[in-house]
C-alpha cells in the first residue's frame, strides 16, 4: 500500500505529524511519500517508511504550473490513500484529478473522508486523520531512531571534560536573542560553574544532526 501526505507548514508542524504517519505506515504496512517544503526534506528522510520526499513550495504561493507538476508526480504511483494537511481550492482541484480513492482532510470538496480534529496535544489529535483508514495512534509511544553517523559526529564535537554541557541553538529569527546575549550566557554560567562546557548549534544544521546533538547531551 502507498500513502501520500501533503504536508505544508513549518518545521514544528512537520514534527507533529511524524507519529501519525509512522503509525499509518506500520499498521497498514504502507510506504509513504511526503510533499513538503524542500527545507524539511532531511526530517522526513529520517522516517524509514518514507520512500520519497516531493519538494513543493506550499508557502510560496504556488502557481498553476506548480500544481500541474505535483499532479503529475502523484498520479504516476498507485496511491491508495492521501492524508491532506493542506487547504484551499487549488489543492482540492489537484486531488480531485488524482484518482486516489481515499483522501482524508479537515475540509475541501476533494476529500472522501473528513478528519474532525478535537482539542488536545497536536501529535495525538492528528489521530483524526487516521481513523477513516482504521489506524489508531498513541503519539506518546513514538520514537525516532537517529543515524549512527550523526550520533558519532555529535559526540566528537563535544568539548573535552566531564562538566555539564550547555547546548546553545540560536535561531536567527525575528525576536531571537541578540548575538551578544548568546555569547555572554556561557560565560555568565561559567563564572558560577567553572567546569561548564558549551556548544553552539548553527541555525542551518541539518535536523538529524541537531537532534543527535540533543540526544548526546546527557
Language-model regions: role of each:
Residues 1-218:
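Catalytic machinery of carbohydrate-active enzymes
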Amino acid at each position: 500500500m502507498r500513502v501520500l501526505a501533503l504536508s505544508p507548514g513549518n518545521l514544528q508542524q512537520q514534527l507533529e505529524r511524524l507519529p501519525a504517519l509512522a503509525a499509518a505506515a506500520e499498521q497498514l504496512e504502507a510506504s509513504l511519500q511526503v510533499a513538503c517544503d524542500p527545507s524539511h526534506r532531511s526530517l522526513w528522510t529520517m522516517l524509514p517508511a518514507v520512500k520519497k520526499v516531493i519538494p513543493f513550495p506550499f508557502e510560496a504561493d504556488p502557481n498553476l504550473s506548480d500544481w500541474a507538476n505535483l499532479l503529475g508526480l502523484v498520479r504516476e504511483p498507485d496511491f491508495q490513500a492521501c492524508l491532506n494537511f493542506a487547504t484551499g481550492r487549488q489543492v482540492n482541484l489537484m486531488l480531485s484529478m488524482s484518482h486516489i480513492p481515499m483522501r482524508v482532510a479537515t475540509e475541501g470538496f476533494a476529500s472522501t473522508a473528513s478528519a474532525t480534529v478535537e482539542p488536545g496535544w497536536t501529535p495525538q489529535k492528528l489521530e483524526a486523520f487516521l481513523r477513516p483508514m482504521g489506524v489508531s495512534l498513541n503519539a506518546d509511544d513514538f520514537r525516532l531512531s537517529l543515524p549512527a553517523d550523526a550520533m558519532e559526529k555529535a559526540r566528537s564535537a563535544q568539548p573535552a571534560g566531564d562538566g555539564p554541557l550547555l547546548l546553545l541553538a540560536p535561531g536567527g529569527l525575528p525576536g531571537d536573542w541578540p548575538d551578544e546575549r548568546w555569547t555572554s550566557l556561557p560565560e555568565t554560567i561559567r563564572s558560577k560553574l567553572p567546569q561548564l562546557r558549551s556548544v553552539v548549534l548553527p541555525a542551518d544544521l541539518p535536523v538529524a544532526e541537531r537532534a543527535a546533538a540533543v540526544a548526546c547531551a546527557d
